[in-house]
Amino acid sequence: MIELREVSFRWPDEPVVLEKLSLHIRPGEKVVLLGANGCGKSTLLKLMNGLLDPEQGALFWKGEQITRQSMRQEGRTATFRRSCVLLFQHPEAMLFNPTVRDELAYGPRQLGLSDVEARIARWADELALTALLDKPPFLLSGGQKQKLALGCLLALDPELLLLDEPSTSLDPATVGWLVDTLIHSDRTLVIATHNLSLAAELGERCIVLGLQGQILFDGPIRMALSGVSLLESAGLTHRHKHRHGKVAHAHVHAHDWE
């Protein structure tokens, strides 16, 4: 579905964020990104979403190389952005319309979809936003803004959903709904998170990024979360509790990734 080949990226006058990184996400996969703060997880999601172009290397969508310029020139930006969507860690970046209703309607209307009202009703109901439809987004709580931003993306019915720390502002009930909704869908998912419980329940495949922007591990999530399977420098060595009450331990040793 989406592939990065030998991708490198750095911000101006900054050290390399990602270096010669290659990965391939297949249709239907549920992939978790783990790594320390500053290792490039958010940057990687923005590259996959086409918001950034790599300094070196290339991005491929369904076998075809794409860049921001090529999508603009060929008029494919809107189509790609409907198919591959990104939920930012801070949802304020996505919310700019007068009301919650307008936010949910914006994407489908821009794409000329015929069932806009049905999409508004569905996701407002699913995310407990119906009573807030006429409110300005800036009056919502942080958790409500996160739910609204998620609803705006799901209203597009995307093929690939990229989530950057989605549980940061969400209440436990909404996190549970998110798990139940996404795990039973055939939608492709890539999620960057520090929430090990969410990672364990949503992910099938785990990619661990090192501080030098390289892939240290790419394999089954259960292997990554068992025993000596998480990178110590990622700051994830602690007990974590799953939604169903099971407590697990994550102990990490750097040499286990060599």
Tell where the protein language model's regions lie, with residue ranges.
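Conserved beta-strand-loop-alpha-helix hinge in the C-terminal portion
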Residues: G213-L236
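H-loop/switch region of ABC-family ATPase nucleotide-binding domains
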Residues: T193-H194
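Conserved ABC transporter NBD signature motif
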Residues: G57-Q69, F80
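Catalytic Walker B motif of ABC-type/P-loop ATPase nucleotide-binding domains
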Residues: L161-D164
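Conserved ABC ATPase signature
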Residues: P136-L140, Q144
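Conserved ABC ATPase "signature" region
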Residues: D115-L132
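Helix-to-loop junction immediately C-terminal to a conserved catalytic motif
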Residues: N49
